[in-house]
Amino acid sequence: MAKGQSLQDPYLNALRRERIPVSIYLVNGIKLQGQIESFDQFVILLKNTVNQMVYKHAISTVVPARSVSHHNNNHHTAPTEAVENVETQAE
């Protein structure tokens, strides 16, 4: 596993496993919402009324609807707080 994914994979997996709704902001400003169904090195499969395959290189930010606890290399990481009013960042 690449060093850059040592945080990314456990974080995305916690969001997937706990079925936490997420807002995904793309680099072009578009906001997508749904639950992470699956992911790999290059894409995230986002489920809402339809499934969308989102390429990671197009993603700016992933914002969970609530805090999530995740583990990184068997070390517990403090819960990540959901960001409120993130829409102002995209404007």
Swiss-Prot record:
Keywords: RNA-binding, Stress response. GO terms for biological process: regulation of DNA-templated transcription; regulation of RNA stability; regulation of translation, ncRNA-mediated. Pfam families: Hfq. PROSITE patterns: SM. The keyword RNA-binding applies. CDD domains: Hfq. InterPro entries: Hfq (IPR005001), LSM_dom_sf (IPR010920), Sm (IPR047575). Residues 69-91 are annotated as: Disordered. Residues 9-68 form the Sm domain. Signal peptide: none annotated. GO terms for molecular function: RNA binding. Homohexamer. HAMAP family: Hfq. RNA chaperone that binds small regulatory RNA (sRNAs) and mRNAs to facilitate mRNA translational regulation in response to envelope stress, environmental stress and changes in metabolite concentrations. Also binds with high specificity to tRNAs. This is RNA-binding protein Hfq. It comes from Haemophilus influenzae (strain ATCC 51907 / DSM 11121 / KW20 / Rd).
